[in-house]
Amino acid sequence: AMENAGAVINKALVAQYTKYCAEAQKEVEKEPPHMRRGTIPEMVLTDAMIANARNESNVAIISIVRLAGEGRDRKLEPGDYYLSPEEHALMAGVKQHFEKVVVLLNVCGQMDMEWVDVYQPSAVLMVWIPGQEGASAAADILMGHVNPSGRLTDTIAKSWRDIPSSENFGAWADGFELYTGDEDQIPYWGGVGNHEMIPVGETVVRPLGNRRYTEYQEG
């Protein structure tokens, strides 16, 4: 998709990753069908591999993937709502060698965004689960062929705890907030709707829609 959009890609790294994916998929298929993961384990990039990639490219694109669905609920755990240790290591390693880093969030729902302040990528593109032509659409955005309007249909908080309605979900072992309902009722006394996010200020990564986040320069 990036090549079709006009980008020059690191073909050696693509070939290496394609080979890895084929081998990893064979291992996944050895598992019973009902126990198979939705994705394969990501290939580990060594510091030397990242440094070599920098010699071939001036922009790095990191894709973060999350899947969920029936029988596979989201969890407040590393590798789901939070970045995994491997993803943290990848972010840190890539930022060490690349000045320009773009993160694609190919995810089924919101996730923790506090890492944006830590690693400060050049851009973060939320593509959700975009479907068959999603890669082409993302490539057109990254190459500047279309305007990433940022007209969000949701409010993305930096942290789960910044969402007011989080007080009404689950029973927290970490002492944050115990479930406030009983066995028969869930109280929606507050925190429902995007208007509840307005007072939280810096806890919001981007506010709800109706504006563009693209900056323009004439000349």
Regions found by a protein language model. Name each.
Residues 13, 17-119:
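Hydrophobic helix-and-loop "lid/oligomerization" segment in the mid-to-C-terminal part
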